[in-house]
C-alpha cells in the first residue's frame, strides 16, 4: 500500500492578519480517499495556527510535539520551532516522519522540515506568503501576485490563491479549512 500524499497549505500575512488555509483532499495512489480532511489547526491555546503536508499520522505526532515545545518555551514560536526541528532531525524515530509544517503567530511565519530546516519567508510587497505541498507552488505564486497587485485582505488572498491551486493541482481540492489570527 502506498502512502497518502498530496495537499496544499498556504499561509498569508497582511496588515496584521495571519491566515493559514489548507485543502481537504487526501489521495492514496491515484484515488481520492477523502475530500474533507482538516490539515490546519490552532495550537498554543489558540495563539498559533499550523498546517501540514505529508503523512497525516506523522503530522499529528508533530503537532503534539510542537504544542509541548510551545509550552516549554513560553509560547515563543521561533524558539519552539528550532527546538522541534532539532529533535525531529536527531531523534531516530522522529527522523522517519514524513511531513512539513507551517506554523504562524501574529509576528512570525515559519516552515519546519525533518531535515532541521526552520525557514521564515521573505516579505513580499504588502505582506508575506509561504506554501507547502503539491499545490504549494501554484498557491504561492497566486498569493504573491495578489499581495502585490490587489488590496484584498489576507483571508481573501488565501481563498483566491487556494482556488487557483485547486484548479491546477490534481492533488488539491477546493474544500478549505481556514484559521485566522
UniProtKB/Swiss-Prot annotation:
Active site: 7
Record comment: activity regulation: Allosterically activated by HslU binding.
Keyword terms: Allosteric enzyme, Cytoplasm, Hydrolase, Metal-binding, Protease, Sodium, Threonine protease
Catalytic activity: ATP-dependent cleavage of peptide bonds with broad specificity
EC number of this enzyme: 3.4.25.2
Gene: hslV
Species name: Anaeromyxobacter dehalogenans (strain 2CP-C)
Any one of the GO BP annotations: proteolysis involved in protein catabolic process
Compartmental location: Cytoplasm
Family assignment from sequence similarity: Belongs to the peptidase T1B family. HslV subfamily.
Self-association state and partner proteins as the record states: A double ring-shaped homohexamer of HslV is capped on each side by a ring-shaped HslU homohexamer. The assembly of the HslU/HslV complex is dependent on binding of ATP.
Protein name: ATP-dependent protease subunit HslV
Molecular function terms, GO-annotated: metal ion binding; threonine-type endopeptidase activity
Binding site for Na(+): 166, 169, 172
Keyword Protease: yes
Amino acid at each position: 500500500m502506498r502512502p497518502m500524499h498530496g495537499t496544499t497549505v498556504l499561509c498569508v500575512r497582511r496588515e496584521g492578519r495571519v491566515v493559514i488555509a489548507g485543502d481537504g483532499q487526501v489521495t492514496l495512489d491515484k484515488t481520492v480517499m477523502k475530500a474533507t480532511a482538516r490539515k490546519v489547526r490552532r495550537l498554543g491555546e489558540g495563539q498559533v495556527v499550523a498546517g501540514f503536508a505529508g503523512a497525516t499520522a506523522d503530522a499529528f505526532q508533530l503537532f503534539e510535539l510542537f504544542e509541548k515545545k510551545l509550552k516549554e518555551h513560553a509560547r515563543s514560536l521561533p524558539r519552539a520551532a528550532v527546538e522541534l526541528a532539532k529533535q525531529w532531525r536527531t531523534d531516530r524515530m522522529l527522523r522517519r516522519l514524513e511531513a512539513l509544517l507551517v506554523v504562524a503567530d501574529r509576528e512570525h511565519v515559519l516552515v519546519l522540515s525533518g531535515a532541521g530546516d526552520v525557514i521564515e519567508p521573505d516579505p513580499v510587497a504588502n505582506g508575506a506568503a509561504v506554501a507547502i505541498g503539491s499545490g504549494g507552488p501554484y498557491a504561492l505564486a497566486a498569493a504573491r501576485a495578489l499581495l502585490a497587485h490587489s488590496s484584498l485582505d489576507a483571508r481573501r488572498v488565501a481563498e483566491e490563491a487556494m482556488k487557483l491551486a485547486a484548479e491546477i493541482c490534481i492533488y488539491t481540492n477546493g474544500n478549505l479549512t481556514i484559521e485566522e489570527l
